From Swiss-Prot:
Native source organism of the sequence: Caldicellulosiruptor saccharolyticus (strain ATCC 43494 / DSM 8903 / Tp8T 6331)
SS bonds (residue pairs): none
Major subcellular location class: cytoplasm
E.C. designation(s): 3.4.21.92
Full protein name: ATP-dependent Clp protease proteolytic subunit
């Protein structure tokens, strides 16, 4: 069942114009990442980021995150695009940023990473499941360990935490309040109202 997407009506000098809510928000350079991070979702987010860069490479983009995480490769596609494009991307956690969602929250431009006061943030090591021959299982296990090291290294860079702290904390699910995420370095400020 697909979710109901609200339509907003806007008055222009040419009359009324109807937009779905996400298209209207995109006009204000707001991108919404909600739900599981899949390849399809990553493609949509990447396309919106690239579009907004083409529209105005000097104006900030606002990425609102409410996600339990998802595919590591899909998350890396979004992360790399955030780093690649010229505009600063401000990240804002509303609700939850867990796993790859928390990773992307930390990916925002330094000084422009926020969470609302009742947000929850969770980091952990990547999860993988593979079946097959012993050799294939070994190959996948070695690969996921490399991914784990890459995620930990980037989290250490983005948060300012020593790699040893990141390795310890991501060994299991590590939950944080917005205030704790601020102290940890995942975000730069807890915000209650727009400035």
């Amino acid at each position: 069942m697909s979710a109901l997407v609200p339509i907003v009506i806007e008055q222009t000098n040419r009359g009324e114009r109807a937009y779905d809510i996400y298209s209207r928000l995109l006009k204000d350079r707001i991108v919404i990442l909600s739900g599981e991070i899949t390849d399809d979702i990553a493609s949509l987010i990447v396309a919106q980021l690239l579009f907004l860069e083409a529209e105005d490479p000097d104006k900030d983009i606002y990425l609102y995150i409410n996600s339990p995480g998802g595919s590591v490769t899909a998350g890396f596609a979004i992360y790399d695009t955030i780093q690649y494009i010229k505009p600063d991307v401000s990240t804002i956690c509303v609700g939850m940023a867990a796993s790859m969602g928390a990773f992307l929250l930390a990916a925002g431009a330094k000084g422009k990473r926020f969470a609302l006061p009742n947000s929850e943030i969770m980091i952990h090591q990547p999860i993988g499941g593979v079946r097959g021959q012993a050799t294939d299982i070994k190959i996948h296990a070695e690969w996921i360990l490399k991914i784990k090291q890459r995620i930990n290294r980037i989290l250490a860079e983005r948060t300012g935490q020593p790699i040893e702290v990141i390795e310890r904390d991501t060994e299991r699910d590590f939950f944080m309040t917005a205030e704790e995420a601020l102290k940890y370095g995942i975000i730069d400020k807890v915000i209650e109202r727009r400035p």
